Amino acid sequence: MNAGSDPVVIVSAARTAIGSFNGALSTVPVHEMGTTVIKEVLQRAKVAPEEVSEVIFGHVLTAGCGQNPTRQASVGAGIPYSVPAWSCQMICGSGLKAVCLAAQSIAMGDSTIVVAGGMENMSKAPHLTHLRTGVRMGEVPLADSILCDGLTDAFHNYHMGITAENVAKKWQVSREAQDKVAVLSQNRAEHAQKAGHFDKEIVPVLVSSRKGLTEVKIDEFPRHGSNLEAMGKLKPYFLTDGTGTVTPANASGMNDGAAAVVLMKKTEAERRMLKPLARIVSWSQAGVEPSVMGVGPIPAIKQAVAKAGWSLEDVDLFEINEAFAAVSAAIAKELGLNPEKVNIDGGAIALGHPLGASGCRILVTLLHTLERVGGTRGVAALCIGGGMGVAMCVQRG
């Protein structure tokens, strides 16, 4: 991916606030959230809609969202019909994979300017049944599309939470260690919110209700005042035989939100007199055993950092998606990461995990955090249901 003297750069990055399940953003169609962030990143980059070559978004729970929701989001943002738009599906990694695909398209010369990102409204995900051939007798069971299409491992037919329990057991991550990761995430997110660290990256979403328009611009999911004592009282959710360690508090949530970035070559940014947020140095993806899908970022990060010609010690900040605290602890342990460099403003346990959006959300947060603290090198990475990981290295300056 390293493009030498004319690398692919990111010139703008924004996200919506993250809504709780059935919360502030639950009534907003997913393509409208996509439209909101596309409009914002184009405006920040001073790029006219007709100058865009392509739009690529990660989106996982597409059932009932209408034909090609990314195309709907693109057109809604004023991008003309002549500009193609499409979505990619890599579960939790979708939003970052979309950015990788955009960078590839530009590096290959197929595109000049690409808007990439991700979006998800988990609150609107429907329940499903198959009635195509009719039902002669009896009840018709409904399947939750969040579970069957997003959170259930297709190879072992169990919930992602069980994969976290598998990681906790194999990497010897105790319940207390998981709760400490979760409390740290919540406390960091609380501090970041109160200090205004997310203000620059968030674009408000206008939500219609009987009371009129409401502006949603603050992440809804964090639980301020979180502490170990309260968290320790929760019972394990996925294994209830006395061996479980994963609880609702040390796992990420089900959430709604969208994020986007604008990419172009460095020379194009210079021509437009734009100062890039960062250049994309490398990216990588890897596969692991699906039963321990959460450790996918370990090989992905190692490979991406090696491609960049860096060592792990060279990296100033990591944004690694907190699908589960057990997973976060195992990754940090295996890679020997300094906790002061990882998710310094909290992660998905506190902020939430809108499936298709999270990959780009963590990249947006990484870019703005690097800028705020004066860091140079950053890594964004996610584990992926089904046993995969994806990682990207970016560099400022």
Curated annotation (Swiss-Prot):
The modification N6-acetyllysine is found at residues 200, 233, 235. The keyword Iron does not apply. CDD domains: thiolase. Keywords: Acetylation, Acyltransferase, Cytoplasm, Transferase. Transmembrane segments: none annotated. The record marks 353 as: Increases nucleophilicity of active site Cys. The active site is at residues 92, 383. CoA binds at residues 223, 226, 252. It holds the Pfam family Thiolase_N. One of its GO terms (biological process) is fatty acid metabolic process. The keyword Isomerase does not apply. It is an enzyme of class 2 (transferase). InterPro entries: Thiolase (IPR002155), Thiolase-like (IPR016039), Thiolase_AS (IPR020610), Thiolase_C (IPR020617), Thiolase_CS (IPR020613), Thiolase_N (IPR020616). GO terms for molecular function: acetyl-CoA C-acetyltransferase activity. The modification N-acetylmethionine is found at residue 1. It is found in: Cytoplasm, Cytosol. Homotetramer. NCBIfam families: AcCoA-C-Actrans. Belongs to the thiolase-like superfamily. Thiolase family. Involved in the biosynthetic pathway of cholesterol. This is Acetyl-CoA acetyltransferase, cytosolic. The lineage of its organism: Eukaryota, Metazoa, Chordata, Craniata, Vertebrata. The gene is Acat2.
